[in-house]
Design a protein with these regions (language model features):
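Short, surface-exposed amphipathic charged segments that create phosphate/polyanion-binding patches used
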Residues: 10-13, 85-96
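Acidic/histidine-rich catalytic cores and adjacent linkers
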Residues: 5-8, 16-20, 27, 35-36, ...
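Inter-helix linker motif
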Residues: 70-86
Length: 178
């Protein structure tokens, strides 16, 4: 999906991942907006779909599962890492800040660290890498979730399905232990 205008009117693009050919474009990102693609494709076309890569839009997910139940759904790296950041890193950061109510200076450092923790290291402004290192050295729970975020990204770069599966199992085990 992509924004058509600044006012957040969206369009949905369906492309063949093998050929990179655009197959269909529709206005909107709701189930109703996406459904005409499956009508156009027909039952035989839907049955031929093996996998679908998409963002974590619930409407897309529900439509794909309804029309192509055999298809493997793969969520894109950006949205998975963003969700991990919102739901895990932010939760740990807020919890850590709340534990420091008696130390306002340290609490403020953690409260103001959101973007430092969520940004990719290569996108940090000059000098912020030192701040990040100091923060992670001083706070083990934040360090743990930051390392887990980095390892989560590596799942998408596995050279083989077997390696991806092994990385997933390792990541999941580590997440349960931390």
């Amino acid at each position: 999906e992509f924004a058509l205008f600044k006012g957040h009117r969206y369009a949905t693009v369906v492309a063949d991942a093998d050929t990179q050919q655009v197959l269909w474009v529709g206005e909107g990102r709701s189930r109703a907006a996406f459904r005409p693609f499956f009508t156009w494709l027909g039952p035989e076309g839907c049955a031929a779909i093996e996998s679908v890569a998409m963002d974590m839009n619930t409407a897309f997910d529900l439509e794909v599962r309804e029309h192509c139940p055999q298809a493997q759904v793969v969520y894109d790296l950006f949205h998975v890492v963003a969700k991990f950041g919102r739901e895990v890193i932010d939760r740990v950061r807020v919890d850590q800040a709340n534990q420091l109510r008696d130390n306002p200076k340290s609490r403020q450092v953690i409260k103001r660290s959101r973007w430092l923790l969520l940004r990719n290291p290569e996108n940090l402004p000059a000098g912020h890498d030192v701040r990040l290192s100091e923060l992670l050295e001083a706070n083990q729970p934040l360090n743990t979730v930051y390392v887990m975020k980095t390892a989560l990204k590596e799942l998408w770069y596995a050279p083989t399905e077997q390696e991806a599966s092994q990385r997933w199992n390792d990541w999941y085990r580590q997440s349960q232990e931390s």
